[in-house]
Amino acid sequence: MYRYSNGKISLSDFQQPMGMHLRENNRWVKKVQSIPWDKIEEKYADLFPSETGNVAKPLQLALGACLIQREYGYSDVETVLQIQESPYLQYFCGYAGYDDSKLPFDASSMVHFRKRLTPEVLAQINEMVIQEAQKTEDSDNQDDNKPDGGGNSGTIIVDATCAPSNIRYPQDVSLLNEARENAEKLLDILHSPTDGKKPRTYRKRARKDYLKYVRCRKHTAKMTRKAIGKQLNYLKRDLAAIDGKLNQEKALNIHQTERLETIRKIYEQQKYMYDNHTHSVENRIVSVSQPFVRPIVRGKVGKPVEFGMKLDISVTDGWTRLEYRSFDAYNEATKLQEMIENFHKREGHYPSRVLADKIYRNRENLSYCKARGIRLSGPALGRPKKGEDRNKAQDYRDECERVEVERKFSLGKRKCGMGLVTAKLEETAAHVVALSILLLNLRKIQCAFLQFLDWLLGLLQSREKRMVIQ
């Protein structure tokens, strides 16, 4: 069940020990003011329809702890300790006063927070934060963005990137060795001393063969194929022994059963590539612990292939939104029309222009934009026409403005936790990416406030100089 909190607490009502004075211009104090906690709490309470049972942690504590973790890159245990020790973080998490006598919650609760705050819930929270921030903007700027006479207006910038997961770079031999070790652990669990003699696994010999391969400085194709064949034989024997135990009415729990299915899938894929002398297979598994991760071919310098979630974002007036995400590789050009329609649902009209990379300029997207009066940036398809006079100044401005989405990617990967996703589950990894987008918008609000203070300070200094001169 969920119990509503008493609402946002002002800094003056925050109970502080004698001699402690919190500053109003602290960034965490400003972040509290920029988030519509009451509206978000109404959505969060819908996740707990039951009116009985243990009371869930308040929304401000759950979301605040997740934001703090993304901001600093703390572990679950360190996040709990930092909240216990810092009065600013406690105020951000909705505490009524500073209290360092006990931990705010157990560190394992962070996993439940990430599961409850799904990407869909975080997308709604992100939209509420954007709408709340837009209300405080100058009304003249809002009127300028509205179309006159129901036409198109505004600009949307789109691009795709990959949020890499924290996995070892996959190699066939090391992947098979890890699968073999996991299969041996499952066999140890299924075997009991009353069953008699334990099935032979040759684990010492398999380990010796694996170390012989990895300790070699140069790996030839013949050597690699021989090592893969040996590991496949060892793994085949282990799986046969596990099947024999399961036929004797032995049972595994849910987590162990899922791990066994992953091992079987790895064996099938590696056996197929070994028999057919190929290095590619559909839905290839690259990690035993995270079987949902897929290789994403990016073609970037230094990183031709990344392993993690691929995502599309859109930037409108500096506000970032997560449009699409998937662990499977896909062509981002197929999602452009969906992103434009999402813009139409939010704003009530289509954008006047779309700034995108060349990969988005296919025939379907060009005809779609032309039918709706939208200008898609970039050159036309095919060879340049004879005597064509392109507006180079317009192309240069479009390219300069399109760089904003690259800045969002850079900031999200360097400062918001998108650069290396350490979550182990598919749902929690998606939570990390969605929360990074929310943190990007909170940083934008904070930077806008600091710019306003600099402008106000400069205005006051100029007035003082005028008074001194007079």
For each predicted feature, which ranges?
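Basic, short loop/linker segments at the boundary and entry of helix-turn-helix/winged-helix-like folds
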Residues: 22-67
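Charged, often Cys/His-bearing segments associated with DNA-binding zinc-finger transcription factors
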Residues: 1-35, 447-470
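Basic, amphipathic alpha-helical segments enriched in Lys/Arg and hydrophobic/aromatic residues
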Residues: 256-260, 267-274, 393-470
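Short, conserved catalytic/metal-binding motifs centered on acidic residues
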Residues: 26, 65, 79-83, 104-110, ...
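Trp/Phe/Arg-rich N-terminal binding region typifying the photolyase-homology
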Residues: 47-59, 72-115, 122
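Active-site- or DNA-interface-adjacent structural scaffold in DNA-acting proteins
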Residues: 96-290
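Acidic, metal-coordinating catalytic cores used for nucleic-acid/nucleotide bond scission
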Residues: 52-57, 87, 355-363, 383
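Electropositive, glycine- and tryptophan-enriched low-complexity nucleic-acid-binding patches
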Residues: 300-346
